[in-house]
Amino acid sequence: MRMTRRRTKKTEIRNDSDSVRIDIVIEIVKRLPLKDVSRFLLVSKLWSEIIRSPYFIRSFPFLFSSIQPHLLYALNSLDKDKGHHKCCDIHYVSGLICFGYGQQQLITNPRTGKSIYLPKVKSRSKIIQSFFGYDPVYGQYKVLCMSERMNDYLNVPSSEHQVFTLGGVQKVEQSWRMIECNIHHRPKTNSVCMDGVLYYGAFTGGDMLEWCLMRFDVRTEKLDLVSRLNESSIQCYRPGHSPSLIKYHGKVALAFETSLHTFELWVMEDAEKWSKIRFSICHSMHLFGQDDDDAFLITGNIHTGEIIFAPYDCDVRFGMTHVVYYDLKTNRLRFRTVAFDLGTLFPQISVMVPFFDYVESAMLL
């Protein structure tokens, strides 16, 4: 009996020492610049698991944290071979950016400067719509893609819904997986990801003309319809300026321009109720040297409660762009000029997409 007890005690001590060593490893690596952390992935399997774990990624100290998000611009470049700009879906979530070029999806971490191409999406169609989500529980990023038909087939719903998983503690197959979708719909807006759930606006119904809000649970990979919207009200947006989905005070909102510099926000209170906010910024735009026909897009709101606008178009050769902040309570605008120096890159740049909730990520690609 005594020998058995001693063995048990030694085992417990050995386990305690292992846990201490893991804590030491984490503290050592956290003190290093992120660009040097990747070198330690090859030290051992244990070190690799620690560095790639959601706990380490969340605890890594950064300048740009969720406490004070920063402004990030993503750039879309010119296709030199074809002589025109590539059509690209650009999504940001939890420190990473996803660029969707049809069947090709590129993931990049602005903090590390590293990027990876995912395996090509297998599809009978070359028209691919992509979205990007994050599950904070398992620390996994997922790309959701679906196929579409163009031209005379706008009333045909999307098909071939596929998912690719990045990161997390769970081992997953590094390939695209088909998922089931029983809701006939066709995506119409960008997406927002909140608390592990991805939302996007879409058309549904027999003729694909009825507005709805779709939801993709990043963890369970389940697609369903959250809410249907009043079709007659939504159809009044300004021609050529499609609605966009934004985060508004922790809720999902559909933002669209009814006329130049006049906007509506449809905020989802629950599945059955949407509240409408209508406002105009025409009265102040000229104070900031803006032309009457300068078009701005609602891109979200920040911690102060202000709504953020960014230009639809930006000529990067001027080396600057503008951001407008609007306070609904005080009916006041403030204007910010963002200067940048792209050097020799500017002839290749087509689109600048702003993200106002950027935080850094220690995710190593």
From Swiss-Prot:
Q: Which residues form the F-box domain?
A: 15-62
SUPFAM superfamilies membership:
F-box domain, Galactose oxidase, central domain
Q: Pfam families attached here?
A: F-box, FBA_3
- InterPro entries listed in its UniProt record: F-box-assoc_dom_typ3, F-box-assoc_interact_dom, F-box-like_dom_sf, F-box_dom, Gal_Oxase/kelch_b-propeller
Q: What is this protein called?
A: Putative F-box protein At1g31000
